[in-house]
Amino acid sequence: ISVFVPDLTSVGGSRDEKALEFVDVLRNDLLNAGLFDVHDAKGIPLDGSGSINFQAFFNAGAEELIKGEYQSSGGRIQIAARLFDVAQEKDLLGRSYEATPGKVREAAHRFASAVMKELTGIDGFFNSKIVFVSGTGQNRDLYMMDYDGRDIKRLTSHRSLLLSPHCSSDGTKIVFSSDKVWSQNIYVLSLVPRIEERRLTRALKLDQSPEWSPDGSKIAYSENGDIFVSNPNGSGAVNLTHSPAIDVSPTWSPDGREIAFVSDRGGVPQIYVMNSDGTNVRRITSGGYDTDPSWSPNFGVNKIAFVRVEGSEANIFTISPDGTDEQKLTRGAGRNENPSWSPDGHYITFASTRNGAKNIYIMYLNGENQRPLTRDGGKSFPTWCR
């Protein structure tokens, strides 16, 4: 979809760089979606009255046009933006925002999400967050950033082997594992009303790869090579697998009725699916070494992303829960690991060493439009949050 996004027009005539950031963020959001061909519309004039010369935009190849204006007053910025269908010369969508200079990016993300919903029917993810691990070895901590890699904030001070964060479906809590106190244990970090951390497991065992159930009522995790499910406070833990094999990395289906996980019960690690009570276990992959599953939160997509180790490389695949329709999303580019789905199930964030250092990337669910979010290395285990 060809979208032209001219700079905002100042109503009062004065230039405000923070207000102009709105368009920069908006253009970047639409590019990151991978569904739009975005243009800045330079050289296409408005007529003298300030109305839109639709014919000029149509001749330039525009299908959609976003036009906006702003006014700065008293330390606040008022922004009005509209989406037009160029061929029909039709007003499709309009939004107005009043923001402090520090909130202009948030307003742009909100408008980009509204535009994406209007043009594609897909909920925009531009106001979402990505939580990730930064650091190496025994000096790792949890951070949060905007989905586009901006506004990075540190969440923990563990300086330990911190691994596998996962956000609750409402985005208010993060579960992860850390060896901050002796062995790997499960922790929960609450983000509202304030940042508060609780340790859920306390045994001298290997507790890792936790994940919230979709309704937030349970946490699945692995302990010493078995899959367990507990209440959010760590009580009532139940062993689902009781297997002599190593079973790790549980991930819930969108309705919470099934769990996919990794097991080497067949000789090498493969992806299996079972009911959430541990019954009806079946294998769904047959590659050489498959691990790190992540089930899409959207039944409309209903795919499981996973990692297949292929020699010195590791690549991300998707597969249907019944073991059909396997697709390779990354190829020939280092180690691609830790896939995590966007809340709408149409995008995947992941970690990759394709350029040497390990950084966070995003891509569309079919593997197209792979784009880096970080560039300074030492980043791993991204998890998408609302």
Predicted regions and their residues:
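Hydrophobic beta-strand positions that form the internal "hydrophobic ladder"
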Residues: 130, 174, 216-219, 259-260, ...
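Conserved beta-strand position repeated across blades of beta-propeller domains
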Residues: 166, 211, 251, 294-296, ...
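Residue-level detector of Asp-centered blade-edge/turn motifs that repeat once per structural unit
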Residues: 124-126, 169-170, 214-215, 254-255, ...
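Blade-level signature of beta-propeller repeat domains, shared across WD40, Kelch, NHL, RCC1
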Residues: 357-386
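Short loop/turn segments that connect beta-strands within beta-propeller blades
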Residues: 87, 146-150, 190-194, 231-235, ...
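Short beta-strand->alpha-helix linker/helix-N-cap micro-motif
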Residues: 1-56, 66-70
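A flexible loop/linker signature enriched in serine peptidases of the S9 family
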Residues: 123, 134-141, 157-160, 177-186, ...
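Amphipathic beta-strand/beta-sheet edge segments enriched in Tyr/Trp
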Residues: 50-114
